[in-house]
Amino acid sequence: MPLLDSFTVDHTRMEAPAVRVAKTMQTPKGDTITVFDLRFTAPNKDILSEKGIHTLEHLYAGFMRNHLNGSGVEIIDISPMGCRTGFYMSLIGTPAEQAVADAWVSSMEDVLKVEAQNKIPELNEYQCGTYEMHSLDEAKAIATTVLASGISVNKNDELALSDSMLKELSNH
C-alpha cells in the first residue's frame, strides 16, 4: 500500500491550531490544487467532539468560502479528518498560509455569531446523513478555543519523518 503524504509528518510535533500545506498537485490543464491540513487540536492529545465537529462541518465550509474564495482561489471541499483533530481543505489556487489562517479566524468569529441551532445550514434529514447529531454550543466552544489560542503554521520540512524512521515504522 502506498504511503500517503499525511503519514510522512511527525504528528507528535504538530502545533494546533495550525495551518499546513499538506499537498500540492497540478491538474492536466495546469491548475494548482492545494490541500491544507487545518489542525484544530494536537494529535493524540485532544479530539473535537462528535456533535461539535459535525456542526462545524456545516458552518465552516460556507464561512471559509466567504472569506477565502476569489482572486485565483476556489475551495473545492472542506472535510473533517477521521481522527477528529481537524479538517482537510482542498482548493484551486495557492493562497498563503497566513491568508488561510486569517480566513479561519474570521470563520470562527462567524460561528460565534450563529444565533440558534435552527440556523445551521442543511440541518434536515434530506440534506444531512445524521441531522440530529449537532451541537451549536459545542461548535461555538471549539471556535472560542481556536480564537483564544491563535493559529500558527506547521511546515512540512520541520515535521518530516526521516527515511529511517519511516522504514522502522513500516516494520511494525
Curated annotation (Swiss-Prot):
GO biological process: quorum sensing
Cofactor(s) recorded in Swiss-Prot or TrEMBL: Fe cation
Cofactor, free-text remark: Binds 1 Fe cation per subunit.
Keywords: Autoinducer synthesis, Iron, Lyase, Metal-binding, Quorum sensing
Domain of life from the UniProt record: Bacteria
Known EC number: 4.4.1.21
Catalytically driven reaction(s): S-(5-deoxy-D-ribos-5-yl)-L-homocysteine = (S)-4,5-dihydroxypentane-2,3-dione + L-homocysteine
Transmembrane feature ranges: none
Enzyme class per UniProt: lyase
Pfam family, one: LuxS
Role this protein plays: Involved in the synthesis of autoinducer 2 (AI-2) which is secreted by bacteria and is used to communicate both the cell density and the metabolic potential of the environment. The regulation of gene expression in response to changes in cell density is called quorum sensing. Catalyzes the transformation of S-ribosylhomocysteine (RHC) to homocysteine (HC) and 4,5-dihydroxy-2,3-pentadione (DPD).
HAMAP family, per the entry: LuxS (MF_00091)
Subunit structure: Homodimer.
This protein's name: S-ribosylhomocysteine lyase
Organism the protein comes from: Aliivibrio fischeri (strain MJ11) (Vibrio fischeri)
